[in-house]
Swiss-Prot record:
Location, primary (coarse class): other
InterPro entries in alphabetical order: ATG29, Atg29_N, ATG29_sf
Keywords: Autophagy, Phosphoprotein, Protein transport, Transport
Protein name listed in UniProt: Autophagy-related protein 29
Gene Ontology cellular component terms for the protein in this record: phagophore assembly site
Pfam families: ATG29_N (PF18388)
Coiled-coil annotated residue ranges, if any: none
Length: 209
């Protein structure tokens, strides 16, 4: 509808102008309205405008009324189409929300969340484990070496005690000389036991490695 194919009638109070004719009386019903909509809604795109004169003859209705009803029918169907589009969009949104909720439920159900207990139960890293093993080996080897050293000292002390008990009491001078010699021997034995303990420590370390 535009200014070339549309006529607007305005009703004003006053005398009728000369030559004015009252619009003809006509009958309009739902059947004619459905037929009108079928005709105007199935127009070919190549057709520029509606042939209102032909439609007026078919329906025996004035052109202005047909134009008004056609405009009203298009407006109603456009509004209905808009409602359908909004409804479809709402349904798609609701469906997507349901899908998201379903995925969230699956995630919470089948993928356990990380708890503090899990953090506490995390196994140590290989570097930490290796460091702990090395410290344990060093401690064990050191204890073993100290045990060897202590044993050698005890043997040496026991040997000195038994030798001194077997000697006569009247040979004190010789005992003094022997004690000095035994002290030197004890120092040598201690040095020897230390070297033996050192060798045992090295052998234990090599065995551990």
């Amino acid at each position: 509808m535009n200014s070339t194919n549309t006529v607007v009638y305005i009703k004003v109070k006053g005398k009728r102008p000369q030559g004015f004719l009252d619009p003809p009386k006509f009958e309009w019903n739902g059947t004619k309205e459905r037929q009108l909509w079928t005709m105007v809604s199935n127009l070919n795109y190549s057709q520029d405008q509606i042939d209102w004169q032909n439609l007026s003859k078919i329906f025996e209705t004035p052109e202005f009324f047909l134009k008004k009803r056609t405009y009203k029918l298009f407006a109603e169907h456009l509004e209905l189409l808009q409602l359908q589009l909004e409804k479809k969009r709402d349904l798609e949104k609701y469906s997507n929300d349901q899908v998201n909720e379903g995925m969230s439920d699956l995630i919470h159900k089948y993928i356990p969340t990380l708890q503090n207990d899990n953090l506490l139960n995390v196994s140590a890293s290989p570097l930490t484990t290796e460091r702990q093993d090395s410290e344990e080996v060093e401690t064990e080897v050191t204890n073993e070496a100290l045990q060897h050293l202590q044993t050698s000292k005890i043997l040496n002390i026991h040997k000195k005690t038994s030798d001194s008990e077997n000697k006569p009491n009247d040979k004190l001078d010789k005992d003094g000389i022997n004690k000095e010699m035994e002290c030197g021997s004890s120092d040598d034995d201690l040095s020897s036991s230390l070297s033996v303990s050192k060798s045992a420590l090295e052998e234990a370390l090599m065995d551990r490695l």
